[in-house]
Amino acid sequence: MKTLNSTPRADGFHMPAEWAPQTQVWMVWPERPDNWRLGGKPAQAAHVTLAKAIARFEPVTVAASAGQYENARRQLDQPNIRVVEISNDDAWVRDTGPTFVINGHGEVRGVDWGFNAWGGFDGGLYAPWNRDEELAAKVLEMERCQRYQTEGFVLEGGSIHVDGEGTVITTEECLLNRNRNPHLSREQIEAVLRDHLAVDTVVWLPDGLYNDETDGHVDNFCCYVRPGEVLLAWTDDSNDPNYARCHAAMDVLKNTRDAKGREFIVHKMPIPGPLYATAEECAGVDQVAGSQERDPSVRLAGSYVNFLIVNGGIIAPSFDDPADAEARAILARIFPDHEVVMIPGRELLLGGGNIHCLTQQQPAPVKR
């Protein structure tokens, strides 16, 4: 693997939209007992369900630690799922894996962002995180992809959504947080995004979903569904703490044009719940200094927006909630050429995220 001294934009590469053709999806096998209850066993079962759902549409590669490799391999024993051994600190490959970029000549490379476990020692979710910091480079090594490294710049893949046509959406709550890149101004952060995603327009939403422990990742709140169109988590309940967040985001989107000069079409997605972990679920998580404490009184940041687009499919979470059926109908309407597959998302949510957070698509090479 070669680490390049240039940037994707300078070399003619860009991050494609999630609906672009993919060669595979990456996942990481969960096991961390201070994040996943009961030693991670319920979460592992949920990951098997997720991997098999994706594998109906395209290949899946699941990275597992040495101690869990055989267990993962046996549980994921089907032809379209590959299991490889990569040491890791947790399963959030959207944030720890590389952001793949492509050009028009059939090449795929990767951006290796800095990672500090969502805040380092200022509100981060666990320590140490050195194995997660190394994961992107190992994935790129495995795929023989050349690497761009943003030395000294922290970013998680869940904090950005692109349309592949020059626009990225993010949140101020995350990217301007003092625990990510406090040494950089908003303008300097935008410059890094422009250079490494090859975008021209950065759309800043004020906040993400209430109580999102990643500091408001956009992939749990607002996502692109096609160029010029987004899906926004929404509530009409003025007593819901998400109400002000949703309306503030809508104000930005309604008064912003994208890189192509288009006004945004905004589709609304209901927010499930409110959802909470039970005392029993919280008691199953090991208590370790420096790790995120699980508390049944704290609302979970459940969201149907946290879905993954794959080749011909939409893999979305369900929560055994009255809004599940409406969420499915909305996704089916927005993606008429995709099959909507909903899988139980509660166990993933208990760990702090959901389907999009736990997956990373690898785009297919494009030759023009």
Swiss-Prot record:
Annotated signal sequence range: none
InterPro entries attached to this UniProt entry: Agmatine_deiminase (IPR017754), Peptidyl-Arg-deiminase_porph (IPR007466)
Pathway(s) served: Amine and polyamine biosynthesis; putrescine biosynthesis via agmatine pathway; N-carbamoylputrescine from agmatine: step 1/1
Function: Mediates the hydrolysis of agmatine into N-carbamoylputrescine in the arginine decarboxylase (ADC) pathway of putrescine biosynthesis, a basic polyamine.
Stored HAMAP family: Agmatine_deimin
Residues the record marks as active site: 357
Pfam families reported for this sequence: PAD_porph
EC number from the UniProt entry: 3.5.3.12
Keyword annotations from UniProtKB, A to Z: Hydrolase, Polyamine biosynthesis
Name of the top EC class for this enzyme: hydrolase
Family recorded in the similarity comment: Belongs to the agmatine deiminase family.
Alphabetized NCBIfam families for the sequence: agmatine_aguA, PRK13551.1
GO biological process: putrescine biosynthetic process from arginine
Assembly information from the UniProt record: Homodimer.
MF-aspect GO terms: agmatine deiminase activity; protein-arginine deiminase activity
Chemical reaction(s) catalysed: agmatine + H2O = N-carbamoylputrescine + NH4(+)
Name of protein: Agmatine deiminase
